[in-house]
Amino acid sequence: MLRDLGGGLILRRATGADAEALAAFNADQIRFQDAPAPFVPLGVWTRDLLEGRHPTFTPDDGLIVEESGTGVIVSSMLLVSQTWEYGGTPVRVGQVELVGTRPEYRGRGLVRAQFEVLHEWSARRGDLLQVISGIPWFYRQFGYEMALPRGGGPRFARTDLVPPAPGAPLPFRVRPMRADDLPFVVELDDRSRRRLLVSVPRDEKLWRYELEGHTPGSGTRLELRMLETEGGERAGFIGHIPALWAGSAALTHYEVRPGLSWRGPWPAVHAYLTATGESYRARGDGAFTQIQLWHVGLEHPLYDAVRFTDRWRPFALYARIADLAAFLGKIGPALERRLAASPLAGHSGVLTLSNYREGVRLAFADGRLTEPAPWPLARDVVGQEFGQPSSDPRRPMVMCPGLTWLQLILGYRSLDQLQEAFPDCLVRTGEARALVNALFPRAPSDIWALL
């Protein structure tokens, strides 16, 4: 037992023996909105995690709140550690997942109590960033801000784009991915992630986990397919959800090797998705009405090669950075590369940022980040704050309300976009604006977390 929470409830670590009970709990409590039945794929995924199939998660990375008298689970969450990249720099991340509480126990602080423990675990592991894919607003209560993009790719009705006729000759074809494809896939995936600010690297071991490690029916399992030429030469790969998703055949990945047109394999992929969606309809998944690329993300080279006209609104991932100075120090190499490529190359000076409660100070010498450090805010400055130029160095150069500075640092919004959305996002000088724009431009990210 980690804590006695009172009221007949205790907080403890999960164990492998909890696999079946927690699988049933998560499938029931984390079902889709207004769904009449549990969402079984979340139960399968939970069982995979607690039975040791995941490459980094162990059962005692989970928390359970249970009734001390009956052992009935009433609340739970898990921590899945992994390594992501920010501008090519590795960063340790703790992803919080499968957060659920029985309705009769909600509003009693059980999630907050678990976060206190989980955040401590994550910090001890050296995780500088925590993320959650979660319901709207809720996790803002625990120090999280929506600051990484999620989804937003196009969709089209089956009648809008007609696929090639069955049996029509095509210059590319789709086949299952095999283990011997993985060196090619790793190289192509690494290349594709250069388009992105924040991404999740995978070596051959982790790609093999994605290919073979998930139990069929798991909510995190994808169907992975290779694209190849008529002569059998590898041309790229795709991924898709192995079921109809809101009536859609849902593409998640589309990558082609350098030197090939992004448009070239699309007719074969379109035909494959149409046939696959029909097979899912025939097995009882429901109506097959459209093909969607929401999970491919808001920005992708395919969208410049194939004309799509309709999109679902993107969502976002929550992010938490408890020690911003440490995080900025870790991503220092990426910041220095950006500065070197900007009009402020070789810059020397200081940038101070504030969220009106705390601050951080970045010092640069000849373009090198030398001193990222917490920067306590002065409480005795003279007069009101209007964000105007000042001779008082205790006034921060950039002020972002609340946790919106995470949107800036993680490339979710540019400084101009933040100022448009938040009137109290203030920049004191032109030099500060130029430096922030050089260090923290808006940049695309695509998060396929290791789950």
Language model regions located:
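Glycine-rich phosphate/pyrophosphate-binding loop shared by adenosine-nucleotide-utilizing enzymes
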Residues: 70-76, 94, 232-237
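Conserved active-site alpha-helix within GNAT-family acetyltransferase domains
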Residues: 124-128, 133-153, 296-315
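Intrinsically disordered, low-complexity, positively biased terminal segments
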Residues: 1-20, 24-40, 44-47, 66, ...
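Conserved acetyl-CoA-binding loop-helix of GNAT-fold acetyltransferases
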Residues: 96-101, 107-120, 261-277
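PAS-family sensory domains and close relatives that share small-molecule sensor folds
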Residues: 82-83
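N-terminal, Lys/Arg-enriched amphipathic/low-complexity engagement segments
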Residues: 45-49, 53-63, 76-78, 88, ...
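Flexible glycine-/small-residue-enriched beta->alpha junction loops
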Residues: 146-170
